[in-house]
Amino acid sequence: MSPENDIRLEAGRKLFAGAVNFLKSAPALEFLPAPTAPEVAFAGRSNVGKSSLINALTNRNSLARASTTPGRTQELNFFDVGEPLQMRLVDMPGYGFAKAPKDVVKRWKWLINDYLRGRAVLRRSLILIDSRHGIKDVDRDLMKMLDDAAISYRVVLTKSDKIKAVELEKTVKAITEEMRKHPAAFPEIIATSSEKGTGIAELRAAVYDAII
């Protein structure tokens, strides 16, 4: 491991070693907090393990769960990181609309599209993909939205402990190849496990990289 990477990892650790607090939920653009800090958004299909990953990232047991009670699932949830404030995490509503009413789907797409295109402090979006299932068409739809909005994004694999190492390697290779076709995609994939702690230090460093 290089000295430069050691510095990144330590900076990422320090970033999340202090205060992390739920700020607010925003069901529409007029409810967004003032753009006073850089933001990194977490997006992913429903049940991809987003809340668990945010909790592992921030060293909290129920931080994300506190803002995702029933009725808030179609809102953007903001978390302040650091005192004084250094950045904000944005928990985007889970997508994958097989059982969702059409008006809910349309409202979600409007909110996300408007947020991505109009939020000057958004530094990067992290797209969470379940290691067991790989990229789905709904993920590709979001990637196209990010490409069109010229928002840098990076794929983060969740639940990497749930598949064999050889299968994980194949998944990482396949997704890396696909990411090369997307102009706004960061080419390197981060494989994580909220349960085992795998990849969490690198994910913290990646968030730090995005805001400096």
UniProtKB/Swiss-Prot annotation:
Binding site for Mg(2+): 51, 73
Pfam families linked: MMR_HSR1
A GO molecular-function descriptor: metal ion binding
Cofactor(s) required for function per UniProt: Mg(2+)
Domain called EngB-type G: residue spans: 36-212
Positions bound to GTP: 44-51, 71-75, 91-94, 158-161, 192-194
Sorted UniProt keywords: Cell cycle, Cell division, GTP-binding, Magnesium, Metal-binding, Nucleotide-binding, Septation
Gene Ontology BP term (one): division septum assembly
Function: Necessary for normal cell division and for the maintenance of normal septation.
Family statement drawn from the similarity comment of this UniProt entry: Belongs to the TRAFAC class TrmE-Era-EngA-EngB-Septin-like GTPase superfamily. EngB GTPase family.
Protein name as it appears in the record: GTP-binding protein EngB
Source organism: Zymomonas mobilis subsp. mobilis (strain ATCC 31821 / ZM4 / CP4)
